[in-house]
Amino acid sequence: MSRNRQTVYTYKANNIGRNLFSDQQKLASGNGFDRVTDSNPPIFLPLPEPAMPLSQKRLLFNETHTASANRLYRLDEEKQLRFQLGYIHDRTTRQYGSEEIYYFAQDTVHTAINRHDRLKTDCLNGEVNYEDNAASRYTRENFSFAGTWKSGVSDITGDNVIFQKIKNSQWELKNYFNQLYTKEKYTWGIRSYIRYTHLPALLTVIHRNLPVSSADNRLIATCIHRRDELNLPDNINENTYRTVTGQTYESIPTEYEEMNIDNAYTDNALYGMRKKNGVNYQLTGGFRGELSSVRQENSYSVPRYSFYTIPRIEWERTDFLLTAAATVWWNRLPKQSYSRFYAAPSLYFRYKFSPRWKMSLSGSLDESEGGIQDIYPFHYREDYRTVVKHTGKVAVTVRQLYTCYLEYKNTVKEFFWTLSASYSHNRYNLMAERNYKDGNFYLSSVERNHSSYSYALNTIGSKGVYDWNLKTSLELTLARNEGKQLNENIVQNYRYDYLRVEPKIVWAPSALFEVEYKATVSCGGSGIGKDTRLDPLWDVAQRLTLSLGFHDTDFRLSGEHFYNDLSKDQHLNTWLADVSLIHKSGKWRFTASAMNLFNKEQYRYTLYSAVQSYTSWVKLRPREFMVSVQYQW
């Protein structure tokens, strides 16, 4: 390693619940591009990724290997060239389940599932980044590629017995170029961004409603996937019979869904800025284009392009800041015979009353069209129980957002207080409809204008006592969401209310000892239609951490308590504890730790969404002991 040339090679392996994907993403820091808004590539057959309320270290059963190579060349004082190459191999298993209740207009649907997922991911990524940062100009050229191969297998039991397999890959190329010039009070430049993504995906669903053994299941699955030897077509829509080692199995319905998506996107713009008398004038003009295509039983494509200009003015003085902007768009989707011209204004004002008091106000109006996933007019199976079909119409969303913020700060007394409020109003031209029949959810869209609303109030107070080495804070959040749902052509109103309180205390009575306490107390309740009211449920999460340090040795003991209302008359308490000991000696570092000391096997919780409630469980990592030795040279 030298000043002009720096090389870093890394290899990491992990099976203790740590997510190493984020470490790889931090190395590829050049993928952040200024002033570029990229719509995410469409994914029609997603892998299962359930959201869980606990930290990943308690839930993630993984075996991960990562390797990377980074090379930096400093060509001179202004120029540098960086190469990065990385690879990730990951195997993850999850066991979880839920009991769900859907409150439809004419019926209440109960479902129950237990799942065992096995996911495998391989990812190869690379990047070349060149920067030239001279006194009067800045140049950046970034090229990156990524290939991700994912495969997920799920054994699902409950209302039905199902085997599901999803293969989901993504190959992507990106190129970003930015050239900026400055001269006195003027700044101008050009930027260009191009992305191409290919996403092949395959879904296999095998319905196993017969009580056959697990060994028989594995044998049947092996036979089904060897279609070429059985001389069967790729798409099996009828019951297929298997005969293995002289035994005849009952009929096993099997479904296949194969979709190949291509998505190309570009954003190119010219921009300029001038500063005069404390006022900053900015103007941006550009072109965006996107082409998405889907190959299923039929081929379907959605080209779109837009021209835009963004005038922006920023006026700043010692005690206030005023920013006004308006994005003027002309959007065109020729295949859908859709074109629209509109403006999206925004305003931000900040005023400082005194060194301690500050307030701000903001408001914005924005409009957007849905992607190919919202337009695609052919039905497809998203997973083992979800079938999707849209109208082919362009989904348009108009958003209004208003916020207010007030702050008080007294540094001498270590007291801080903030108050913020927000209001959001969204208007839609299409309404999503969800129906349930024969174990399947059918999702579609219907042309119907409707609106949704959300209100939020948040306040944070913090007080410290320097002489006591004490820091305290309290956060309070109130929120309400209102909207509509459609089921069997009947519209229902729904409302969801939410309360959250978060106290936190950090106390260090001596240089050797520290206590930290943090809690989250939340309550949510829903109202659906005129007659359905869901009981408010309380959830409490508390964490207490005791830290003791003596010379080169640190000891930490942490405990967590979770209280969850599963229903009006049933609740659950869960206790978790961890301990660790770290000793440093010169360049050596010795660590011993134990996780989940009480060896809890499962965590359960109940949550509400807008029109449903679900009680879920998830398998926890068992009691684990770990010893590590590190040496730094």
What kind of region is each of these model predictions?
Residues 1-4, 135, 333-339, 366, ...:
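Solvent-exposed loop/turn segments connecting transmembrane beta-strands
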Residues 1-3, 324-334, 390-394, 402, ...:
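Transmembrane beta-strand segments that form the barrel wall of outer-membrane beta-barrel proteins
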Residues 1-151, 164-193, 215-222, 275-278, ...:
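Membrane-proximal, glycine/serine-rich, low-complexity loop/turn segments characteristic
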Residues 9-15, 40-48, 94-110, 152-161, ...:
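Outer-membrane beta-barrel translocator domains and adjoining extracellular loop/strand segments
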Residues 54-60, 113-119, 162-168, 255-261, ...:
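Outer-membrane beta-barrel domain signature
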Residues 64-90, 117-335, 352, 415-423, ...:
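Face-selective signature of the C-terminal outer-membrane beta-barrel domain
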Residues 396-442, 451-453, 465-477:
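Membrane-embedded beta-barrel scaffold of Gram-negative outer-membrane proteins
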